[in-house]
Structures are given as structure tokens and as C-alpha cells.
Amino acid sequence: MRNILFVQFANSAFLRHGECDRYWDAFYKRWHDIGYYMGKYVFEIPKWIAEIAYFIPNDNKELFYCEHCVDEIVAKVNNGSYDYVLMSLMNANQHMIYEVISRCPKQKFLVGGYNDKFMRQMEKELPNVVICDTTAETAEKLGVPYKFGTDYTLFKGEHVIPRLTLSYGCLNNCKFCIVPHGKITPVSDEVIIQQMESFSDLDYRLVYIDDKTFGQASNYKILKELSKYSDKDDFNGFIVQTTTGLVAKKAKEFREINVKVAEIGLETFNDEILRKYRKPSSEKFIRESVSAAYENDLMLIANIIVGLPGETQETYTKTYDFVMPLLEKGKLIGINPAIYTDYDNDDNLGEIDFMKDEQYELNKIWWNKFNASAAEILDR
């Protein structure tokens, strides 16, 4: 029996970004009663840990949250006796992970994540780390059979929104997206039900469907029956992310199968920029999706990207002037502001100030304005 340590970076380990944090605090406070629960350490449970825990049932598993700095992780690892330490690398923590591994040279690390260029370079430079592109590869490195499912025992009692997978892939081909496109691979009904039942260890009212574009896979209608597998008497439904076009066409059906909230890939309210980035959307579809959702009592959140090359004072203003009145009127319940990430150029990724091009000041102004205005509206 092996000793496996999962390391997860808590929100508090990262720099605070001012208006962004104010917005999310306001959002979770406003919608807490319907089930928007923020975890004690992180916004949501890291699903990769639950997936790996599922296929190593016979190992001793331990979870460690890094709340402040890498010194905590280094001390934990060097004072323990672990066969493997597992971490997930993102732009925001990549240099922290590199430091941890370099300071624990006798420890074996398995690392997965999103920035392949950085991870491959790290693997070349540090002999005690192996990169795993998928959880299936992690199973291979651990020498166990891979089986998809989830085990949330390590998170027992946490007050959160768990994630559930119906399918992998996406039929769209958005220019800035790293999700494999052109094909959808559905998950079996048996595995979908297993995931739902595994949430019994958690305190939740909403479940987030983490398909990149909900409604593309043929099995999305299973949500209608899936609610009965929740052991929570106050279960309130599902959150999905999808396109404006699918919401415009299927808002009524989504509500009928217990979708409570839809996040739409609005990104920017500008046709020219949407076309440039191959978004399956338009100003027309965006308007239609808002109307359809409102008419069918489907709560709507607009995902917005700040920093897209091509944005100007005029285009930002157009998006802002479209979105904020909808938030005021309750036709949107929130926005999801995100920073544009160019994964082919990772020199300055991971912090709000990575956008150091000629539009840096403009992007920064609008990032703060979107977050501050939305927070003010939700705080009322």
C-alpha cells in the first residue's frame, strides 16, 4: 500500500486582484441561497483529485491545501514519507510548482495541467517529475488500471458545487480554446450515475456540468432522470456552459431537464471580433439567447473575455453597455470575467498584469470596470 499526497493551492496562496475578488464575493453572497457555495479553500473542488482517488482505492491518500506559500508544501513533503506527490499546474501556480519540485529532489512528483510548454521544459530540467497529460496517464505511471469515476472522500463535508462530466470534446473550433475539437465522446450512463452518487460526501445544492458545450452530446437529456440520484432533499438543479445559439434554441428544453443556470460564451458583444476568433455566436444569437432564457426562467451568466486582441475603447464600451443593463434588470444573474490567455506565448501568464502589450492600460481599466460595476449591482 502506497502513500499518495495530493497538493492543492488554495485561493489564499495567490495574489488578490482587488475588484475581481470584490465581484466574486458579491456574486456568491447574492446567490448563496440557490446553491452557489464557495469552498473553504478553493472556489470549487479540484475534480482531478476525485478522479485519481477513484482508481487508487487501495492506497493511503492524503490531501494538503497550500494556503500561503511554497514553504508549506516543501515542509510537508520533506517531513513526510510519500511514494508520490501529485499536483495540477496552471498558469498562476507554474513557477510555485517548479520551486517545490526543485526543493524536494528526493521526492517523486506527478504533475498534470494546462501549460504544456512550461511542463515539458520543467520535465527536462528536473529529474524527479513526470508529466501526465491525462488522468489515464497518471494511472499508467502509478501502475494501476484506469477507470473513470469520482471519489470525494477526501473532501467529505465540504460546502461546494461539484462537477460532473457527461462528455469530452467540442464540435466548435474557437481560436483561443485548447479543448480538443471536432469530436464528442459521451460518458456512459453508468459512469454518469456513479459521479452523481459520489457527491453524497459533499454539501451541495447545484451540480456543474463541465462539458465544454452542453447540449452537443446526445446524452444531455439524462439530466432529467439524474436528479433522483442526488441524496439531497434540497437539490436545486444543474449549471451548464454552452453557446448562445443553443440557449436561443433550447432554453425551454434545458429548464425541463432541470438546468437551473446556463453560462453562455458571450466573450464580447462585437460581431467582427466574434468572427475573428471563430466563436459560434453573433450579436443576434446573444440577444436571442437572453430573451429565450428570460422567457423560460433559465438563469443566465455571461462569460466575458478581457484582453482579446482587437478590443478597443469602442468595443469594450459596446459590450459593457449591453451587459450591465441586463444585470440591472435581472436578465443576467452575473458575469464570468476572464483574461485572454495565449498558450503559445507563456512568458507572462498567470497574473492580471500579464497583458503587457500596447493595450495594457486599456485592458486593465476595463477589467476593473467590468468587475467593479457588476459587484456594485449585485451588492444592492
Tell where the protein language model's regions lie, with residue ranges:
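A short, flexible N-terminal coil/short beta segment enriched in small residues
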Residues: 1-55
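Conserved SAM/AdoMet-binding glycine-rich loop
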Residues: 4-6, 193-301, 306-311, 330
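C-terminal accessory regions of radical SAM enzymes
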Residues: 4-16, 314-380
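Short hydrophobic segments within beta-strands
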Residues: 7-9, 88, 112, 167, ...
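Canonical Radical SAM [4Fe-4S] cluster-binding loop centered on the CxxxCxxC motif
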Residues: 17, 29, 34-41, 46, ...
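Glycine-rich beta-alpha loop elements in corrinoid/cobalamin-binding modules
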Residues: 48, 55-149, 335
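Catalytic cores of alpha/beta
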Residues: 120-125, 250, 309-325
